[in-house]
C-alpha cells in the first residue's frame, strides 16, 4: 500500500530532523479512500497508526491520490480545499500547522 510507505518515510524523515514539529502536539485523522489513518506529532517526534488510536485534533477527508499529491507538495492545501478535494473537520488552526509541516518536509 503506497500510503503506508508514504507515512513511514515521512515519519522517518521528520524524526531524523524534528525541527519542523518541535512545537506541535497534534493528532491528524486522515479519512482516505483506503481507510482511516492518524498522524501524531508530540514530544518532538512523529508517529502514525491505522484506525483511531488517538483523539484527533482535526480530521481531514481526502482521496488517496490527492493525499499523495498533498504530502509531496504537488497539491497545496488551500487549493485542495477550494477545489473540494479536501474537507477539514475540527481545528482549522491545526490543519494550517500541518500544511506548514508538509511544506517544511516536502521532498
Give the residues covered by each predicted segment.
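Feature captures hydrophobic
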Residues: 1-107
Amino acid at each position: 500500500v503506497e500510503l503506508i510507505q508514504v507515512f513511514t518515510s515521512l515519519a522517518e524523515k521528520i524524526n531524523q530532523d524534528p525541527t519542523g514539529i518541535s512545537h506541535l502536539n497534534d493528532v491528524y485523522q486522515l479519512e482516505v479512500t483506503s481507510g482511516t489513518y492518524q498522524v501524531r506529532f508530540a514530544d518532538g517526534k512523529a508517529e502514525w497508526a491505522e484506525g483511531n488510536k488517538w483523539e484527533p485534533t482535526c480530521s481531514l477527508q481526502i482521496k488517496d491520490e490527492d493525499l499523495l499529491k498533498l504530502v509531496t507538495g504537488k497539491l497545496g492545501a488551500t487549493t485542495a480545499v477550494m477545489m473540494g478535494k479536501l474537507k477539514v473537520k475540527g481545528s482549522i488552526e491545526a490543519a494550517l500547522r500541518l500544511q506548514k509541516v508538509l511544506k517544511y518536509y516536502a521532498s
